[in-house]
């Protein structure tokens, strides 16, 4: 049951993040991910993970947690305010005070619900801000993370040690119903990274909808199919956790699902060339989004 709730939370997060990714924003707020950055992501992620693992082993755990909790809480406050998108001064003050109150409550109690709220703000905003520039880049990123996740979960104790040893709002957690003292968890990386591909497919659908005159009612096809595939991947992950009774690299199941779903959709619709040639955040795409908003 915990797995179903965590999976539902992940689906809600990627849905909101994908929708937000198509909203008009200031150019400096957009972080475009190209193929070079896609290759560097797992490298930097691996280095960071190992450094955190070494810090946990050889430094004071309490000191490390305090620093990371403070940093994560500050980032969550910024993301939480951004989620409300207040237009007035009063709205900005209200949103800021509300987010600070939640962060302080988490900092004081470490309650899992407050942690999840902050984690949601981080994840949804990350999906909306970080934007993959093409399907090829997304496939490269998820493909690299596929091997990254397998190695660090099955090949070493690093990821499991860091995930369970550091209590920061960088994962969704839920007390197990049979044993409330134990927590089920889903890392934000398993939400944000596939979510970037889902967000790209949402923008691709928007692009296709504007340019298509033959099938205007099927403008959510790619996003819908990839969203379903992601949900099925989460289901397989939960089954693997239940069957093997051990930590699982979620991207082992989620990466192939989110890579193959758009590919099969494009193949079935005879749109492989269109999918491979689409580039996100071009001037044309921005114009198309503006047109869509005005209709």
Curated annotation (Swiss-Prot):
Membrane-spanning intervals of the chain: 1-21, 36-56, 64-84, 90-106, 112-130, 140-160, 184-204, 222-244, 250-268
GO BP: ERAD pathway; membrane protein proteolysis; signal peptide processing
Cellular compartments per GO CC: cytoplasmic side of endoplasmic reticulum membrane; endoplasmic reticulum; Golgi membrane; lumenal side of endoplasmic reticulum membrane; perinuclear endoplasmic reticulum membrane
Pfam family, one: Peptidase_A22B
Parts of the chain on the Lumenal side: 57-63, 107-111, 161-183, 245-249
EC nos: 3.4.23.-
Residue ranges of the motif PAL: 249-251
Keyword Metal-binding attributed: no
Keywords assigned by UniProt, alphabetized: Endoplasmic reticulum, Golgi apparatus, Hydrolase, Membrane, Protease, Transmembrane, Transmembrane helix
Active-site residue list: 149, 190
Stored SMART domains: PSN (SM00730)
Keyword Metal-binding: no
Entry's localization field: Endoplasmic reticulum membrane; Golgi apparatus membrane
Protein topology in the membrane: Multi-pass membrane protein
GO molecular function, one term: aspartic endopeptidase activity, intramembrane cleaving
Residue spans, topological domain Cytoplasmic: 22-35, 85-89, 131-139, 205-221, 269-295
Source organism superkingdom: Eukaryota
Comment field on protein domains: The PAL motif is required for normal active site conformation.
Family: Belongs to the peptidase A22B family.
Designated name of the protein: Probable intramembrane protease C25B8.17
Lineage, highest ranks first: Eukaryota, Fungi, Dikarya, Ascomycota, Taphrinomycotina
